[in-house]
Amino acid sequence: MFLSAALRARAAGLAAHWGKHIRNLHKTAVQNGAGGALFVHRDTPENNPETPFDFTPENYKRIEAIVKNYPEGHKAAAVLPVLDLAQRQNGWLPISAMNKVAEILQVPPMRVYEVATFYTMYNRKPVGKYHIQVCTTTPCMLRNSDSILEAIQKKLGIKVGETTPDKLFTLIEVECLGACVNAPMVQINDNYYEDLTPKDIEEIIDELKAGKIPKPGPRSGRFSCEPAGGLTSLTEPPKGPGFGVQAGL
């Protein structure tokens, strides 16, 4: 029933070792939430219903094309892509942009708020030009994503959830981005950078500072997600339809 002193000491050591990996529930979602709140909006000088927002003429044409992808009378189905379009135009989603989306799609504003607060990909507060999203979920953590996160913080002089003074970079932690076989990895805007070392991420940041877009994908020399030692299957083009089928069939 009682732990020995040695076992208690061992348990304490493990707790200290793993403590830095323990994160609060929904931490990444909270980081993306308005004012640090997961589902709550509070008016601020830069984010309120009177914040100027309207789509450009070009984006209104894109919205028309998007809506045509859905059956007549089902404009509401276009909430996700139209919100994404608003974010790409503005860089983030003030509540006035959500209201504009609701107006265009003829849905109650609450329907748009529900979507914008559910998906962490929607930024409900301003972010830098380059949004660095570091995966720290288990596979990346086991591949030392902590070293990538620490290298970014040291390089940029900011902590998780902060933006550089020049508004170039915002740093956040995110949950799994679906590229576990290329861990550790980060997403910067729409691009994945994989198989990273601290030196790799520093070089990527330097290129971005210089106005260049680094080549996305693995930094280890792999083409995609094949084994590091090379392919072990599918080493030649497929034979095509009918290969191996009995002649009489």
Curated annotation (Swiss-Prot):
Cellular component, GO, one term: mitochondrial inner membrane
Swiss-Prot/TrEMBL keywords: 2Fe-2S, Acetylation, Electron transport, Iron, Iron-sulfur, Membrane, Metal-binding, Mitochondrion, Mitochondrion inner membrane, NAD, Oxidoreductase, Phosphoprotein, Respiratory chain, Transit peptide, Translocase, Transport, Ubiquinone
Compartments, as annotated in UniProt: Mitochondrion inner membrane
The keyword Signal appears for this protein: no
Name of the protein described by the UniProt record: NADH dehydrogenase [ubiquinone] flavoprotein 2, mitochondrial
Transit peptide: 1-32
Taxonomic source organism: Bos taurus
Cofactor: binding details: Binds 1 [2Fe-2S] cluster.
Topology in the lipid bilayer: Peripheral membrane protein
Enzyme class, broadest EC rank: translocase
Family: Belongs to the complex I 24 kDa subunit family.
GO aspect biological process, one term: mitochondrial electron transport, NADH to ubiquinone
GO MF annotation, one: metal ion binding
N6-acetyllysine PTM sites in chain numbering: 61
Residues reported in the UniProt entry to bind [2Fe-2S] cluster: 135, 140, 176, 180
Quaternary organization: Core subunit of respiratory chain NADH dehydrogenase (Complex I) which is composed of 45 different subunits. This is a component of the flavoprotein-sulfur (FP) fragment of the enzyme.
PANTHER family named in the record: NADH DEHYDROGENASE [UBIQUINONE] FLAVOPROTEIN 2, MITOCHONDRIAL (PTHR10371:SF3), NADH DEHYDROGENASE UBIQUINONE FLAVOPROTEIN 2, MITOCHONDRIAL (PTHR10371)
Residues found modified as Phosphotyrosine: 193
